[in-house]
């Protein structure tokens, strides 16, 4: 149990039958009346954000999230397949539950599979990946006045906007959280 007065960003709590991560909190002490804690909570399962107010003495149970390193094996029509590298157990996750989390991840790369009480709810890809550009338009001289970008398709099939000097077969570094080009490798 954690009291609202001890809330910090990143803490996961169970509240009203759901699991939430605290993304913002503020201790408020008005001139008149009792103090309170104003929070923004992100629902771990649905991704929705709600605002809730707690009394500082109010207690909530903490939610223990298991993040397990697993190897992304392959995808078929409906599922992504992962393997636990310690026990070699395999799990299948429906594509609609995983969403776009794996659009920059190649087969056989490591990911973190997040679960709560045995129920898998998310896959966290590595923060940065290095991928080969499979298709992009050539950049032309004189196009660089405003730091222009062009679309490029990488080996996983995802599209990234890259600077004009990036060419086909270049290896680039991508931030998987934002989908942005970081550098050429």
UniProtKB/Swiss-Prot annotation:
Keyword tags: Cytoplasm, Elongation factor, Protein biosynthesis
Pathway(s) it belongs to: Protein biosynthesis; polypeptide chain elongation
GO CC term, one of those recorded: cytoplasm
This protein's record includes keyword Protein biosynthesis: yes
Alphabetical list of InterPro entries matching this protein: Elong-fact-P_C (IPR015365), NA-bd_OB-fold (IPR012340), Rib_uL2_dom2 (IPR014722), Transl_elong_fac_P/YeiP (IPR020599), Transl_elong_KOW-like (IPR013185), Transl_elong_P/YeiP_cen (IPR001059), Transl_elong_P/YeiP_CS (IPR013852), Transl_elongation_fac_P (IPR011768)
One biological process term in Gene Ontology: peptide biosynthetic process
Tree of life domain: Bacteria
Pfam annotation, one family: Elong-fact-P_C
One MF annotation (Gene Ontology) recorded for this entry: translation elongation factor activity
UniProt-annotated location(s): Cytoplasm
Primary localization class, coarse: cytoplasm
Function: Involved in peptide bond synthesis. Stimulates efficient translation and peptide-bond synthesis on native or reconstituted 70S ribosomes in vitro. Probably functions indirectly by altering the affinity of the ribosome for aminoacyl-tRNA, thus increasing their reactivity as acceptors for peptidyl transferase.
NCBIfam families for this protein: efp, PRK00529.1
Entry's family note: Belongs to the elongation factor P family.
Name of this chain's protein: Elongation factor P
Gene source species: Agathobacter rectalis (strain ATCC 33656 / DSM 3377 / JCM 17463 / KCTC 5835 / VPI 0990)
């Amino acid at each position: 149990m954690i009291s609202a007065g001890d809330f910090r960003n990143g803490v996961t709590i169970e509240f009203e039958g759901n699991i939430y991560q605290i993304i913002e909190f503020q201790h408020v002490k008005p001139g008149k009346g009792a103090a309170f804690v104003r929070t923004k909570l992100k629902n771990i399962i649905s991704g929705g954000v709600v605002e809730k107010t707690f009394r500082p003495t109010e207690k909530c149970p903490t939610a223990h999230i298991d993040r397990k390193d697993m190897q992304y094996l392959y995808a078929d029509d409906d599922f992504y397949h992962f393997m636990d590298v310690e026990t070699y157990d395999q799990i299948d996750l429906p594509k609609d539950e995983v969403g776009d989390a794996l659009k920059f991840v190649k087969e056989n790369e490591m990911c973190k599979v997040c679960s709560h009480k045995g129920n898998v709810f998310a896959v966290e890809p590595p923060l940065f990946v290095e991928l080969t550009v499979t298709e992009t338009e050539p950049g032309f001289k004189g196009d660089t006045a405003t730091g222009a970008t062009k679309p490029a398709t990488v080996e996983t099939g995802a599209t990234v906007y890259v600077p004009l000097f990036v060419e086909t077969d270049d290896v680039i570094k991508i931030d998987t959280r934002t989908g942005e080009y970081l550098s050429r490798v």
